[in-house]
A protein has these predicted regions:
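Bacterial N-terminal signal peptides that target proteins for export
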Residues: 1-8
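General marker for long, soluble alpha-helical cores
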Residues: 5, 18-263
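Bacterial N-terminal signal peptides
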Residues: 10-16
Length: 263
């Protein structure tokens, strides 16, 4: 091998090693403490996870979610009635597996948790163009059941600006192709990820849009978000029209709400 060839090989090996180490870092197992209690509705459990060993990463925040009982294996609410019982509760999803193991005391299961990411899931996501899939993010994917089929459906629907971070918000606020298609049916182009999240956060729904349109308005998506933020509802518009204010633009209606001119 020539000297130049040896240098090139060394560089390639170093690059490969660096990529491998970064991948291993992202796929590290997370550990910490956990607890499970019954939620008030009787169909869910309150799960709390608090990571350990993260002092050097600046990300020691705890996570608390309400999980459907069907999400668990090895656990039921009846276990919380057995004082001193040992429980191994697991949540398995495409992104990985969370295991919370511990004992029951006073209706509460407390112990230690591990989260093990699934390398095959990460490989698929990389192939689909998603990066920065660190273990903490994959843990959230597991808790919110973010899977390949759902992600692919968003891509197929033409949702722009998707990344590994905003997928979590899209999932939390129940953005799916049914919602996207309902907007398309009203003549709106498919919004990007950020706007879809904003629409869902503000509870913009097709039925209310139809009511607003029936009153002579053709709101943009941004205007729909503003209308929800400032409570410019069909009822509010009717009240303004009853006062003889029939030619108010959406912008004027929003200003009336902002400055409380209708009171």
């Amino acid at each position: 091998m020539t000297k130049t060839g040896g240098v090139v090989l060394s560089v390639l090996l170093a690059a490969f090693t660096g990529l491998f180490l970064r991948a291993e870092e992202k796929l590290r197992t997370l550990t910490g403490s956990c607890s499970i209690t019954a939620s008030s509705n009787g169909t869910e459990a309150d799960l709390r996870l608090e990571r350990s060993g993260c002092e050097d990463r600046g990300n020691c925040s705890s996570t608390q979610t309400q999980e459907q009982l069907s999400a668990f294996s090895g656990f039921s609410l009846a276990d919380l009635q057995h004082e001193g019982a040992h429980v191994d509760a697991r949540i398995r999803a495409e992104a990985g597996t969370i295991t919370c193991s511990g004992g029951v005391h006073d209706g509460r299961m407390s112990g230690a948790f591990t989260f093990v990411p699934d390398p095959a899931f990460v490989d698929r996501m990389l192939q689909m163009g998603f990066h920065d899939l660190e273990a903490e993010k994959l843990e959230a994917y597991t808790l919110f059941d973010i899977g390949i089929a759902w992600v692919h459906s968003l891509q197929a629907a033409g949702v722009g600006s998707l990344d590994s971070g905003n997928l979590i918000a899209l999932r939390i606020f129940h953005v799916d192709t049914d919602y996207i298609h309902s907007l398309n049916a009203l003549g709106y182009a498919t919004p990007d990820a950020g706007k879809l999240t904003a629409l869902r956060v503000q509870h913009v729904n097709p039925e209310e849009v139809k009511q607003v349109r029936a009153m002579g308005y053709q709101p943009t998506l941004d205007e729909l978000i503003q209308m929800r933020i400032f409570k410019v509802t069909p009822d509010f518009i009717h009240r303004m029209q009853a006062r003889g204010l029939n030619d108010l633009t959406i912008s004027k209606l929003v200003q009336i709400r902002i400055f409380q001119l209708a009171d």
